[in-house]
Amino acid sequence: RLAVDYDTRHCQTYTYRRETQMPKAYWISTYRAVNDSDKLAAYAKLAGPALTANGARFLARGEPSKVYELGLMQRTVLIEFDSVEQAVAAHDSPAYQAALAALGDGADREIRIIEAA
């Protein structure tokens, strides 16, 4: 993307600069097991607002429509962020850490944050 800067001192001077846009980041959570549905519900009540307050956009969540390879029917959550740094900051935020404390051992899961190509 190009941005145009207009120089007000020299009415005819334009400066073109290339705007660099950071690649988006995707947070992928997979749940291997839910050990305590009450703890998971408490986590979900806190985690959603904590993440959206930090720029998260929930793209998909739930059981897979179709599985291949190992065929594991794991609950999966896909969240988009504007950057890896934003996703990491959301994870490390006090509000999300409170959600993790509420979850405790209520689920066996994995979170991955990846940068878009």
Predicted regions, residues:
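C-terminal structural segments of small proteins and small subunits
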Residues: A87-R112
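Short S/T/G/P-rich N-terminal loop/turn motif that feeds into the first structured element of a domain
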Residues: Y6-R75, F81-D92, E115-A117
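Short hydrophobic/aromatic beta-strand or adjacent loop that forms the aromatic wall/cage
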Residues: Q74-T76, R109-E110
